[in-house]
Design a protein with these regions (language model features):
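Enzymes acting in ubiquitin/UBL processing and closely related pathways
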Residues: 1-16, 84-198
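Cysteine protease catalytic domains with a Cys-His-Asp triad
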Residues: 1-92, 96-102
Length: 198
């Protein structure tokens, strides 16, 4: 997921869009860890300084959107945030949109967002924004198998951020979408490694 994140962030920058940040999965995990274990010391915690910088960038308008691919655990039709004892078995997409004061949530199984995710994002946003954010559905292709969630989640995010380049994929085109994603990542890695070689 992080290689696709890098390639998509690069596509955004190439399109002149600098106001969108796509979080690394480890950055999202750090926000979750702070919420679970250090919520009272978030504003002082040294290891949280880069997380606070992202929040400050939301506050001052540097970023208008922050997107993340989130690993969740589905059990008996309910969704929970993953942790070290219950690793994720499904990927969803979250986009914080300051311009519309909304949190867009895309799940290819159409399950509601985990309560802990809702609470965590409210907690984090409360440190950096004053308005109330409303939850809304993020358009996503519905999943009919047990293994396409990463590609569907990734394309849902890409479609929301760069719709002309990334249309939502029809369910029957998941294999082609995987190939297209691989080509995008290889192209990105080839270009960035050749730039570094000059």
């Amino acid at each position: 997921m992080d290689l696709f994140r890098q390639a998509l962030q690069d596509q955004l920058h190439s399109a002149g869009i600098k106001s969108v940040l796509i979080l690394k999965t480890t950055t999202f995990d750090k926000i979750l860890s702070l919420y679970r274990h250090d919520a009272m010391t978030y504003l002082e915690e040294q290891s949280a300084s880069y997380i606070r910088k992202h929040g400050e960038a939301l506050m001052n308008g540097t970023y208008t959107k922050i997107a993340a691919s989130v690993s969740v655990q589905i059990e008996e039709g309910q969704t929970f945030l993953a942790n070290h004892t219950e690793p994720g078995n499904h990927w969803v997409t979250v986009i914080l949109d300051v311009e519309t004061s909304s949190i867009l949530y895309g799940d290819s199984f159409t399950l509601p967002p985990p309560t802990e995710l809702q609470d965590m994002l409210r907690w984090w946003l409360s440190h950096h924004r004053t308005e109330t954010f409303q939850w809304a559905d993020l358009p996503i292709t519905l999943q009919s198998d047990g293994f396409s969630c990463p590609i569907l989640s990734a394309y849902s995010m890409a479609h929301a951020l760069l719709p002309p380049l990334f249309p939502l994929i029809p369910e029957e085109n998941c294999i082609q979408a995987r190939i297209d994603m691989l080509i995008l990542i290889i192209s990105y890695l080839t270009r960035t490694s050749s730039v570094g070689d000059e």
